[in-house]
Amino acid sequence: VSGVDDYNTTADDNHICDLSYQYNETHITIQSNGLPNHDFHSGPGCCASAQDYSWTLPLTPTNDTDCDPDLATTGCEMAPERGPIAISVNGVPFFGPEDGPGGDAVAGNEGAYEEDRQNVWLGLCHGHSGPNGVYHYHADANCVHWHVDESAGETWLDYSINSSRSGSEHSAIVGFAFDGYPIYGFVGWDENGETKEITSSYRLKEGETGYNGIEDYEYLAGIGDLDACNGRFSATPDFPNGTYHYVSTFVNGEGGTGFPYFLLCYRGEAESGNTDEGGGGGDDPDCSGHGETWGPGIGPPPPGCGGGGGGQGQSSENGIASIPWFKAPPDSGAILLSLLALAFVAAAGLRGSAYPAVASGRAGTAL
């Protein structure tokens, strides 16, 4: 498998994106090293390095009954202002809009204000690395699906966010939130089944620029396509009967910034323990309690532990190439769609697409 390069170094880095997983009847635990499947920029926080992530997500999301994001974020669990809020299909964490100084990193990167507190800029796919070499995305993340046409002399530097925004087909899943709901790319279907860029319903408050981060924005229901969490219920190629899902947005319904870019709150009940950078670390995990506190029909394994004995609890070998192929989305929960997405990373190679082409109608995925 061909590795990828960090454009902030002079060396041929040959970084390898690596994932493995275990699952049982209720949860899936994904281990990743946090390195992407595409070339990237570490940015001022150079340089990105392999991490030890373990993310646990529910196979079947459960709505938070206290949360009504059509109205506001009141009653909803807010995504962390710093650190991971979701996971990409390549195992790289999604962060919220704010970066170290407290400003909206995406708005600053797009020239909405001058960041004078710290040197912050975003590279390919609006990602960069932070303290301890933690690579992450603040927006976009559609690099996981983009093809480099080497015969035409292309490199990853030819990737353009507009190529992901102007597609004639429904976008693929780019990741999953910690409540188990999928996150799609920019393009979705309108009420007539036609493709369009999906827009945020947030806008800057009068006189603000994003310099103060989240507090500079207000939710105004109806100006865009999405609710206060940056999600909606609608049909997708993977769920022709409809599902709640979040959308990676780059503009709002008025043509302004697409804050919050991924999600601001969780419509479902988010799994605890994922927001501390995936529970990674160097200590050996405590795997006691199998059959009593965790295991098939009981709950997910502790981070870093295998799936346990028998039943539907399963474990993969290390390495992304071990992820299996599913011809159609499995019935055992929405989150297993991530395995299908990750299988394409393995099947097509790390420099190829991480997901299949999808049909432009509402009938489903064309495989």
Predicted regions and their residues:
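Core of folded catalytic or high-affinity ligand/protein-binding domains
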Residues: 89-95, 99, 103-156, 178-179, ...
